[in-house]
Amino acid sequence: MLDPLKVDSYDYHLPPHLIAKEPVQPADRAKLLIYDRKTDTITHTIFKNLPQFLPQKTHIVFNDTKVIKARIFGHKSSGGKIELLINRPLENERFNVFIRGKVKVGTTLHFSQGLQAIVEELIEDGTRIVTFYHDEKRLSFHELLPILDTIGSIPLPPYIDRAAKKEDETNYQPIFAKKAGAVAAPTASLHFTEQMLNSMAKEFPFHFVTLHVGAGTFKPVEANLITEHAMHSEYYEIPKDTIEVIESDEKVLAVGTTVTRTIEYYVRTKKSFGECDLFLNPLNPPKRVDHLLTNFHLPKSTLIMLVASFIGLETTKRVYQEAIEKEYRFYSYGDAMLIL
């Protein structure tokens, strides 16, 4: 019997060739595994067929965050090369970032287009606090964005293990992305095409939340017990019409783990914006979301634990094993799973 308290219980072996390095084209031709909790059955289909499996009048909630070109390459004054990944903006025009390359407080980093960053603090979790400057002017997030658009690249997850290409700027961005701020895509959204959304909108009400996905989403759980894990936090906001649906009795499909966490955090706090650090797992299951659409996630990640919060650990392992046997493609550019 697997112990849902132990992080090692969420481990599984994934053959490396099943890690998707590129998305399926067109996006809605990805495979879709459907797990029905009422009947304990698994159905295999393609994503385009999603609408015919959803209960009538299901309200669909998407995350409209937009992935920014958060990865930039530069050098120190000494000439040493560095790579910087913006994790999130903070107050007072400061930014939490990851830096590959040794830096200390006070180090100035130089990028193209005259952009500079000064290292202000080294944080215990391995991140750094920096301020950005251009022509000696300290930059806000909105002033930095157009420069990132010019010199930055899309921050593909580490397991994709290749440099970002021009196509990734489209492929790694939901087609309804609107509010800039994420450094990782809400990947369940990547399967939708314009045509599919237009068709579904006639049948299902659409709603949005914003949660700016941080790099912490890829962070492995290093504790031995899930109760010892310190969850990362991410900024979210929920508009009034979405709150009305959350507070109603309508059936809700969350498109992705980020939407799930946002809705469930609101249910627990009644706060329509702020920092979400909710960790859903079998010991802290969802209270409001009825159905989940998601991709296949990394072993021992908080995301596979979230899946297990819906269907239990044993079932999660069984479903994932069947997906591996059926050669589903895993992770951000991979195939999808629907929990009914």
From Swiss-Prot:
It is found in: Cytoplasm. Keywords: Cytoplasm, Queuosine biosynthesis, S-adenosyl-L-methionine, Transferase. It catalyses: 7-aminomethyl-7-carbaguanosine(34) in tRNA + S-adenosyl-L-methionine = epoxyqueuosine(34) in tRNA + adenine + L-methionine + 2 H(+). Its main location: cytoplasm. Its EC number is 2.4.99.17. One of its GO terms (biological process) is queuosine biosynthetic process. The keyword Transcription regulation does not apply. Pathway: tRNA modification; tRNA-queuosine biosynthesis. Pfam families: Queuosine_synth (PF02547). One of its GO terms (cellular component) is cytoplasm. It comes from the Bacteria. InterPro entries: QueA (IPR003699), QueA_dom1 (IPR042118), QueA_dom2 (IPR042119), QueA_sf (IPR036100). One of its GO terms (molecular function) is S-adenosylmethionine:tRNA ribosyltransferase-isomerase activity. Transfers and isomerizes the ribose moiety from AdoMet to the 7-aminomethyl group of 7-deazaguanine (preQ1-tRNA) to give epoxyqueuosine (oQ-tRNA). Monomer. Belongs to the QueA family. This is S-adenosylmethionine:tRNA ribosyltransferase-isomerase. The lineage of its organism: Bacteria, Pseudomonadati, Campylobacterota, Epsilonproteobacteria, Nautiliales.
